[in-house]
């Protein structure tokens, strides 16, 4: 049941969206330009920089790796992060305070130092292959989102509802899935989105964890840009937005777009 | 049962952080104490340099301003979004995420087009006669902050919308029906309940902006060097990992201090905040 | 610490068995090349596929920029790759860190066909496989009189018009060397006077760039009119601003080379020699040059004037260039970075 929003607040939000979306107009424009350099307004319209993404084999290959890593890494981080977030809120009084700080550490340590240390002591120390270490590194990198963003949603959850369900004989896991989870759904989805995007854009950690035969899309894009200064990079950004819109359209058609919210 | 859940549920994530992050990073940072000139010599060298202190203070300043601006902008926007009907709400959330999908190089190109000497802002201001000479807006602390706020407002919106949604509407309505004006309702009901979200957002934005290096480098240049760029130079250009780890250790200590101050403030506003 | 180490290993091993099954185990004969990763299609057609027929092996790449790959090679103690492509200042760092094998020139017959300058640019280590220049570019429509000397960088009419390569890029330290020459001192010996000259440049500098794409953006948006640049960026700058011109400097340009080295831990040394010999051969160099990938260093490559115009090409041009002393430069680099930060950071 929406309530009325003060016009001043509404106007402020509109300005914020203008601020957020205006640079995107420039990026979309630049991606369509028929020039070998980034320019705005675009000079001549062309889709060749989009075609370029699909024609270069290294982009296709690394895009698949990036998607796999982002998906598995995010899933792994939610799998271990959500239970931690739950415990931190459910047993807030009993658990030590430093525990919640612990889960911010992965974004608190500068990424290249994290990547360097991980490569030095884990991958090389134990001979772990490149692909699993990439996934582990990404899962840890995005863990703060899984724990803290979900945790923020749990903070306003009324745990007495859960107790009521359990006292009526509902087993704990089922209680969590049917009573707790629907109430923090927006938080879990926000965490997933933030984690996924962080993982798919990551350069600093991936730089160290990729190895012979395995690379990720952002690193491949940087490699391309060592030599070419064309709008391919803008096209990649636009393509990511289009994919997002596409995924949303599918969700809209199947589940209804209100899934993001309660 | 409770005891098992209490300690068992956070265990996998705790082990992951300890094994994959704390031990490896501690081993790296331990190298900074092994210098021949004494255990803390690299740290003394850092703080003895006026230039490095200036970089540290600038980084703190930029990160704090970015955090404050992102908090206010993100909170108000998330509040408005949370009031919207379901479908529009989802569309707005998706739109807010779009800036995060752009790479840093194209994003800074867009700012070049907007804030540059021949950019849109300067052109507009000149054509309406407000200025006669183009303003130098790029490569200032301001341009770095604008670009960082741009990147962190979406994160704040995403974090806070979920939290504001969770505040039971009947609570605010009850407060209003009891005759409370909007501002007291906001201060006494909404703000305390949103505090956990605000603090999580603030922590994520502060740590993110404090450690960033690509945005300050592209939009600030050398005049606005920040700790992340400085660390990057040490690690990836001179291969001086002891120096880089020193910078990292200083950054970690400062961030932990700031994060715990933030948590303390949050607990004062709302004792339930983690 | 022991317990921690144990937990660490146990976790890693259990996770490895879970996730590691997905990655195939190494083949018996795999040749690993570390290089940048751009122009993959042409590299594949011109070099990789033909070489596979020679070596009868699998070829795997590690990609990334100079610093990333050299850092990783060092962390692995010189193992994991067989040959590594690097730009000159980074290969010098790799040499100083003991990451490469010394080269036995008799195993690379094609060395005799390449320019003298490229055969052993860094002592007993890997040869250069391509050559380029660092010089000045300027917008001839807006900069008058034209740029004819490195000293023109200090001209008062170029206030807020210049971009230099950042000190941490390949060409960055060369800006310092030119500043030393401008001040009439040896930059390695008299850091103080050298950086006085760098400081005198500050009011002319809008922003220093860290990547080629950043430079092209600065030029195309009109933020910058004069830059110190590497030749391979010229074509893109001219596409954006037609009047961008490569300055004819009376002191001449500075040479830069990209090298290829055999890593210390290579397990396929014979193949590595064969590979290096192959990429220096006339046929490969000819194809790479014709397709705009790399400037040729093999003296037998023949290009039409049109093909040659984007490259440093021909005995006369190559002869006019000189290499800088990488070992001296790397020794000074840490100090220079600090000084540079102080000058431009204020």
Task: Annotate each PLM feature.
Chain C
Residues 38-44, 80-81, 85-223:
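Extracytoplasmic ligand-binding site segments that recognize negatively charged/polar headgroups
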Residues 20-26:
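Sec/Tat signal peptide C-region and signal peptidase I cleavage site
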Residues 27-93:
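Early extracytoplasmic/lumenal segment of secretory-pathway proteins
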Residues 135-142, 178-181, 257-269, 287-288:
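A bilobed periplasmic-binding-protein/Venus flytrap-type ligand-binding module shared by bacterial periplasmic
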Residues 132, 196-201, 209, 240-264:
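Periplasmic-binding protein-like
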Residues 89-93, 220-221, 225-243:
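A ligand-binding cleft/hinge motif common to bilobed small-molecule-binding domains
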């Amino acid at each position: 049941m929406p309530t009325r929003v003060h016009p001043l607040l509404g106007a402020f939000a509109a300005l914020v969206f203008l601020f957020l979306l205006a640079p995107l107009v420039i990026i979309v424009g630049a991606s369509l330009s028929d020039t070998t350099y980034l320019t705005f307004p675009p000079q001549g319209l062309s889709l060749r920089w989009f075609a370029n993404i699909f024609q270069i084999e290294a982009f296709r290959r690394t895009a698949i790796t990036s998607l796999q890593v982002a998906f598995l890494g995010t899933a792994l981080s939610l799998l271990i992060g959500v239970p931690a977030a739950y415990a931190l809120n459910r047993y807030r009084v009993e658990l030590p305070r430093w525990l919640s700080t612990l889960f911010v550490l992965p974004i608190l340590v500068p990424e290249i130092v994290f990547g360097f240390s991980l490569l030095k002591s884990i991958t090389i120390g134990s001979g772990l292959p490149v692909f699993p270490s990439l996934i582990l590194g990404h899962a840890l990198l995005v863990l703060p989102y899984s724990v803290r963003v979900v945790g923020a949603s749990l903070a306003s959850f009324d745990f007495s509802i859960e107790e009521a369900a359990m006292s009526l004989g509902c087993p704990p896991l089922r209680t969590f899935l049917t009573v707790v989870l629907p109430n923090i759904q927006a938080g879990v989805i926000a965490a997933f989105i933030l984690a996924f995007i962080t993982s798919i854009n990551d350069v600093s950690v991936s730089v160290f964890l990729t190895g012979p035969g395995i690379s990720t899309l952002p690193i491949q894009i940087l490699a391309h840009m060592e030599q070419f200064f064309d709008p391919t990079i803008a096209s990649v950004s636009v393509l990511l937005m289009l994919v997002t819109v596409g995924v949303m359209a599918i969700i809209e058609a199947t589940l209804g777009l209100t899934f993001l919210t309660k | 049962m409770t005891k098992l859940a209490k300690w068992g549920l956070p265990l996998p994530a705790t082990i992951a952080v300890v094994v994959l992050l704390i031990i490896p990073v501690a081993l790296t940072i331990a190298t900074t104490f092994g210098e021949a000139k004494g255990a803390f010599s690299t740290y003394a060298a850092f703080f003895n340099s006026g230039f490095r202190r200036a970089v540290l203070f600038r980084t703190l300043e930029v990160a704090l301003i970015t955090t404050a601006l992102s908090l206010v902008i993100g909170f108000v926007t998330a509040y408005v979004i949370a009031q919207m009907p379901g479908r529009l709400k989802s569309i707005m959330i998706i739109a807010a995420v779009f800036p995060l999908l752009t790479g840093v190089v194209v994003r800074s190109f867009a700012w070049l087009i907007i804030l540059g000497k021949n950019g849109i802002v300067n052109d507009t201001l000149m054509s309406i006669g407000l200025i006669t000479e183009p303003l130098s807006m790029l490569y200032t602390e301001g341009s770095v902050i604008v670009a960082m706020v741009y990147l962190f407002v979406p994160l704040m919106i995403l974090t806070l919308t979920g939290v504001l949604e969770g505040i039971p509407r009947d609570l605010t309505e009850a407060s209003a029906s009891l005759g409370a004006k909007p501002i007291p309702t906001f201060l006494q009901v909404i703000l305390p309940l949103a505090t956990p979200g605000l603090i999580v957002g603030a922590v994520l934005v502060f740590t993110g902006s404090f450690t960033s290096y690509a945005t300050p480098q592209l939009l600030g240049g050398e005049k606005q060097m920040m700790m992340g760029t400085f660390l990057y130079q040490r690690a990836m250009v001179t291969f001086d990992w002891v120096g880089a780890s020193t910078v990292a250790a200083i950054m970690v200590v400062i961030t932990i201090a700031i994060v715990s101050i933030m948590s303390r403030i949050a607990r004062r506003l709302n004792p339930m905040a983690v | 610490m022991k317990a921690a180490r144990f937990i660490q290993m146990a976790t890693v091993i259990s996770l490895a068995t879970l996730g590691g099954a997905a990655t195939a185990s190494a083949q018996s004969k795999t040749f690993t090349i570390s290089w940048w990763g751009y122009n993959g299609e042409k590299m594949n057609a011109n070099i990789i596929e033909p070489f596979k027929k020679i070596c009868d092996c699998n070829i795997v790449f590690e990609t990334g920029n100079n610093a990333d790959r050299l850092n990783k090679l060092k962390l692995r103690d010189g193992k994991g790759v067989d040959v590594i492509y690097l730009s000159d200042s980074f290969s010098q760092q790799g040499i100083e860190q003991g990451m490469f094998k010394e080269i036995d020139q008799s195993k690379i017959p094609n060395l005799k066909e390449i320019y003298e300058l490229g055969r052993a640019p860094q002592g007993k280590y890997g040869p250069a496989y391509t050559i380029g220049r660092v010089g000045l570019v300027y917008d001839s429509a807006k900069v008058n009189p034209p740029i004819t000397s490195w000293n023109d960088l200090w001209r008062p009419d170029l206030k807020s018009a210049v971009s230099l390569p950042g000190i941490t890029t390949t060409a960055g330290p060369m800006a310092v060397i030119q500043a030393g020459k401008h001040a009439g001192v040896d930059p390695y010996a008299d850091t103080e006077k050298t950086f006085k000259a760098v400081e005198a440049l500050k009011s002319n500098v809008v922003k220093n760039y860290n990547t080629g794409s950043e430079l092209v953006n600065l030029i195309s948006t009109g933020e910058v009119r004069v830059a110190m640049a590497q030749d391979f960026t010229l074509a893109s700058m001219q596409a954006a601003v037609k009047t961008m011109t490569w300055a004819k400097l009376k002191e001449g340009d500075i040479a830069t080379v990209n090298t290829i080295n055999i890593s210390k831990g290579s397990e396929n040394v014979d193949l590595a020699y064969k590979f290096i010999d192959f990429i220096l051969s006339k046929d490969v160099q000819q194809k790479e040059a014709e397709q705009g990938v790399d400037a040729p260093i093999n003296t037998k490559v023949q290009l039409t004037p049109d093909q040659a115009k984007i490259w440093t090409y021909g005995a006369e041009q190559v002869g006019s260039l000189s290499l800088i002393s990488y070992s001296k430069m790397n020794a000074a680099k840490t100090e220079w970075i600090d000084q540079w930060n102080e000058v431009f950071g204020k």
